[in-house]
């Protein structure tokens, strides 16, 4: 159990021994440091239940807490707010435990198996800035879950089976009608070598999409091609496989730049295979009805504050809907992986869609015991407050965004970084992009400021990297000069704030896990780093004459460095050797 949790349990035990039965004690950082480092505000609730004066109860409690040697300066303020600080001995013991085992800060009892669906890449299309937040938030949530000891399974869930693929195949058939894929009578072996390049796809899909909007006949042809593809047309399926392979390789390269990985590279096509079995099961439940030629499930509830449309199981043309594909994904995932929870990381605007799917999953008992979570996010906007665009108003590709930030980041690197300058600039750029993307609460929109987010000063990824690298360099220099350090032996005014920030790691991680938002981790990481830098600027660690003080300072530096690296890793940010 981590330090704060232990203290809360001990205080709870003391309070209950006085006859005040409380279920939990929560210590929060005090807003008035002159009274103490932490505050307990639960006395008012106890007083209400016991019909007693809250200040009298608070005085009873602090008298009892005098027996706890880990606490100092226990006092009551106002009507019954208990303030306290931890003894230097208790904090020193905590630091030495963490130094020997950093995982103390990353404990979590209620471990689960969690399936995460994020990324949302579409085959035959380039990844653009609209895909950034799903990748960053999803990857960080996965790493957070793993850091707390949960088992995770992640899936990119490619958009690889709908009309966009029909459009691409149709346009190929218009341009190269003699290819064997379009000959219904072809009986030979299809080519091993792909006839499709990613450059082809980047041009073909936009062209086909425009044609479909302008020409109803072209759109109808695309519908027919899509239907034939989904019904198993051999030639179309062979070409489709090539499109998937080529496009997926390009998508993987971009995700790799973002330090984003997936256990599964499955897509809508994989879920499509489960639809017949799922429909057969649903048909036994007698919960569907016909509506204008379609088969639907009513998912409305009496206490709904908004109008929920019915879940469309089968469209009026006999095809499976997009909702059905997502329900089939849940059906397949529950059956194959038996997760405790499934998290979907997608744009806020998909909230109604997913809530409808989740309700259908519960009504059909496809996922009766699985918690289905929609982790919606806001948009990344430009300086005009509208979704981020290129200068000419187009949608910016993710690669272009990364390159822009990389150019800005490269300007900040030391001139003596020559050999791996490009690699380091890339690492710094990704830190700028990811940290900025994770600072706001998940559901909040934010404005992307290229210059601000690339700055080496302030609340930025590059600032955190630079500071963490400096810690590592300090420890390396101590080793070079044969300056040894072991345990923390003392905490002074210079290091107290650092320690108090470190104490909050476990609580912040668990809260972030529960809210599915990384903003409090980004905030705590900045506080830890900033408090360390304030300390660093006030002392001369390696030239300190007092060995006890110097050893403690170096040990604390080591602890902060270890936690910074781990917290940055949770956010999906790598620390380069230098910058």
Question: Across the structure, where does each feature detected by a protein language model lie?
Answer:
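Non-catalytic interaction-recognition regions
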Residues: 1-92, 108-579
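Secondary-structure boundary elements
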Residues: 90-105
């Amino acid at each position: 159990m981590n330090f704060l949790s232990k203290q809360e349990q001990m205080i709870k035990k003391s309070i209950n021994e006085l006859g005040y039965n409380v279920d939990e004690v929560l210590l929060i950082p005090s807003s008035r440091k002159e009274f103490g480092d932490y505050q307990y505000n639960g006395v008012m609730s106890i007083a209400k239940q016991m019909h007693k004066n809250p200040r009298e109860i608070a005085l009873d409690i602090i008298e009892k807490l005098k027996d706890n040697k880990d606490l100092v300066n226990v006092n009551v303020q106002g009507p019954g707010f208990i303030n306290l600080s931890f003894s230097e001995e208790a904090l020193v013991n905590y630091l030495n435990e963490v130094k020997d085992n950093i995982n103390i800060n990353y404990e979590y009892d209620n471990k689960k198996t969690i399936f995460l669906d994020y990324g949302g890449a579409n085959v035959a299309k380039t990844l653009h800035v609209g895909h950034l937040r799903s990748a960053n938030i999803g990857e960080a949530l996965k790493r957070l879950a793993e850091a707390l000891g949960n088992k995770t399974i992640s899936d990119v869930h490619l958009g690889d089976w709908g009309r966009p693929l029909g459009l691409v195949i149709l346009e190929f058939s218009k341009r190269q009608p003699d290819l064997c894929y379009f000959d219904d009578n072809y009986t030979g072996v299809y080519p091993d070598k792909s006839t499709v390049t990613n450059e082809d796809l980047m041009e073909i899909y936009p062209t086909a999409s425009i044609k479909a909007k302008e020409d109803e006949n072209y759109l109808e042809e695309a519908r027919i091609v899509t239907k034939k593809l989904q019904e198993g047309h051999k030639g179309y399926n062979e070409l489709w496989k090539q499109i998937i392979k080529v496009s997926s390789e390009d998508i993987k390269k971009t995700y790799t730049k973002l330090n984003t990985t997936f256990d599964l590279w499955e897509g809508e096509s994989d879920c499509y295979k489960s639809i017949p079995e799922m429909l057969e099961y649903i048909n036994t439940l007698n919960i569907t009805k016909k509506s204008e030629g379609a088969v639907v499930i009513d998912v409305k509830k009496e206490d709904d504050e908004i109008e929920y449309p019915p879940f469309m199981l089968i469209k009026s043309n006999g095809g499976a809907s997009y909702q059905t594909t997502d329900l089939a994904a849940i059906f397949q995932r529950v059956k194959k992986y038996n997760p405790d929870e499934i998290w979907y990381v997608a744009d806020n605007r998909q909230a109604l869609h997913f809530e409808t799917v989740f309700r259908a999953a519960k009504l059909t008992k496809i996922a009766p015991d699985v918690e289905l979570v929609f982790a919606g996010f806001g948009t990344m906007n430009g300086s005009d407050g509208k979704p981020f665009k290129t200068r000419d108003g187009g949608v910016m590709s993710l690669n272009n965004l990364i390159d822009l930030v990389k150019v800005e980041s490269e300007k900040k690197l030391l001139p003596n970084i020559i050999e791996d300058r490009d690699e380091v600039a890339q690492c710094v750029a990704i830190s700028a992009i990811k940290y900025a993307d994770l600072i706001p609460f998940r559901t909040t929109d934010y404005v992307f400021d290229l210059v601000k987010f690339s700055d080496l000063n302030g609340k930025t990824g590059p600032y955190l990297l630079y500071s963490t690298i400096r810690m590592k360099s300090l420890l390396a220099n101590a080793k070079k000069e044969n300056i040894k350090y072991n345990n923390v032996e003392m905490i002074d005014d210079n290091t107290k704030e650092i320690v108090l920030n470190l104490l909050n790691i476990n609580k912040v991680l668990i809260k972030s896990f529960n809210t599915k938002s990384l903003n409090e981790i980004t905030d705590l990481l900045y506080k830890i780093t900033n408090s360390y830098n304030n300390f660093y600027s006030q002392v001369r660690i390696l030239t300190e004459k007092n060995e006890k003080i110097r050893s403690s300072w170096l040990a604390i530096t080591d602890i902060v460095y270890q936690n910074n690296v781990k917290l940055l890793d949770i956010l999906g940010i790598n620390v380069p050797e230098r910058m």
